[in-house]
Amino acid sequence: MCSIFECLLITAGYFLQSKGHCENCLKANRDPPKYHQEGFETRWSWSYVNYTWPSYDEYLDAAVSGRYLPQNILLGGPRVYQDKVYVTMPKYRIGVPASLGFFPLVSLEKTNILITPFPSWEMNHQGECRNLQSVIATEIDRQGIMWVLDGHRSSNYINGIRCPAKMVLMDLNRRGAVIQVVTFPNEISLKDGGFLNDLVIDETDGTYVYITDNSAIDPGLVVYSYNQNRAWKLRDGSMFPQVSASGYVIDNGFRIDYLGTIDGLALSPFTDIAPRLLFYTPLTSNQLFCVTTDILKDQQLASNQTWRRYVKFVGEKQGSTDGMVMDNKGNLYYGLIPQSAVAKWNIFEPLKTAEIIHRNPKTMVWPDSFSMDLQGNLFLVTDHAHRFFVNNNTLLFTPDEIKFRIHVIHVGTRSYMYSFSENFQK
């Protein structure tokens, strides 16, 4: 039986010269890194989020007026670039004054470190659609451009302004200068109910971005072509919840009955011998699917729905997943929400070989927002997200309870944006 990788190469019409050559090539590329894994370290933690305010008076005014309600702020999306860690604070509820920010990578503070709004307080002001409204996720490409997903449109009623979903490109080498704003029309992401959730960047054929729309009304996979400055959306039954995967209990008895659509996604590393693979999974599902990127890039296939025949069911994971990421050796790291755990699977092996590499019911509650730096480190956040998006759950200000943790582990590889042969910077 062929591996999922070999099967998809054949399906897409790409043939290797010989099976022996294929096995030797893949074996060379999947050798484990020669770096010791020390286990996950909790690098930073927060019991609540606060900001570097322009003045003490502005802080007091925000607290008194309700513009700043610390119990309502969720912290997620860590991305490391140079000397900063960028984080997101989506507006699931009122009282979130800034949706994108950063803190220093090197600091003596490890608990409740203050967040500086990025690129400015003004850009985070919710009164105008040109500003950031509710950022869920970001990704930073190899040139230092941050692709910011401002597409959580369930928050429009919170902001009091109906803004279309958008993606903002910021140059981190120029203090976050905005170089492009991509506004998505309603047929791509709903102005009321859209939920652009996660993204990966494919710097081939002029750069493409693949985005999951976790909308409960119109879920799908959005493809954006940078060269064409065009977007299209693919919809399929594989992107809907698996009802049997709900009803699990985490976080000291919190039952999760939420039915979430397509959410986590990961892109295989670049290789000269085949198109890349995009893996995705609904939030409420044990099922993992994939499709080759040459199919996704073909807008004509997307428009006539024939692309669906190329969607492949990879197999069953150990549980539901929110965040995931792939390194440049084909290792998929993904969260397991029901188990409060993180798992690892190499895509050149059967999915049944996947293993749980860390589990902790106290500190690994809702693992999400996986990312990698240039030094071979894997980052993720645990953020108790379930407490925020369940509307009937009352949030209290509990400054003694740690709610958000950014964990780090050294894996000795680079992110999916790099080829097999590129090693991390020591």
Where are the model-predicted features located?
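Beta-propeller domains
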Residues: 26-68, 82-123, 157-159, 163, ...
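Beta-rich, blade/repeat-based domains predominating
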Residues: 68-82, 126-149, 187-209, 240-277, ...
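Beta-propeller blade signature
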Residues: 99-107, 162-174, 223-227, 395-413
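Short loop/turn segments immediately following beta-strands, especially the blade-tip
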Residues: 104-109, 172-174, 226-231, 291-302, ...
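Blade-loop segments of beta-propeller domains
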Residues: 106-147, 151-155, 160, 182-187
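Blade-level signature of beta-propeller repeat domains, shared across WD40, Kelch, NHL, RCC1
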Residues: 371-426
